[in-house]
Amino acid sequence: MSSVADLADIAVIGGTGFYAFLDDTEEHTVETPYGAPSAPVAVGSVAGRRVAFLPRHGAHHDFPPHLVPYRANLWALRSLGVRQVLGPCAVGGLGAAVAPGDVVVPDQLVDRTTSRPGTYVERGAVHLPFADPYCPRVSDALAGAADDVKRGGTMVVIEGPRFSTRAESQHYAAQGWDLSLIHI
């Protein structure tokens, strides 16, 4: 895929509260082979750097977690030149090591989703490495940007829109992952 523009090299996929972090924004409507993204992509400046923003659930919370157009979202961002995506999220802790308000930069994930497409690959033999799902350079930068950041840990991603049952949460917590988190 070639970029149609180089408008931003970093993007944030997050909640609508992130709009306030961008200065001098302009919206870009992008069509993709996977349909429309969650919303038009806002591109603006943060500390003099061009950053794209896309609300994960849409501008008006139109999409529940299991219906977010994930492939369209990423395709749209890449078509605008984005090379790195940050996905801040509010999560639940699965043990005493993570308290409300803690900032955690995980280094692993367990994907427990089943109904969303997990790849762009639709034909041919392609095997994608995923042993280290988070970019170490970005993780280092995030951890270095704030005090009191917990490094490492495992994010368990569940389908949504429902949260896990108590038994499911206990099961995930019993796996022995340090700094276990759960996210829809």
Predicted regions and their residues:
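Alpha-to-beta junction loops
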Residues: 176-178
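A local structural micro-motif
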Residues: 85, 150-151, 180
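Active-site rim beta-loop-alpha module in soluble metabolic enzymes
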Residues: 133-174
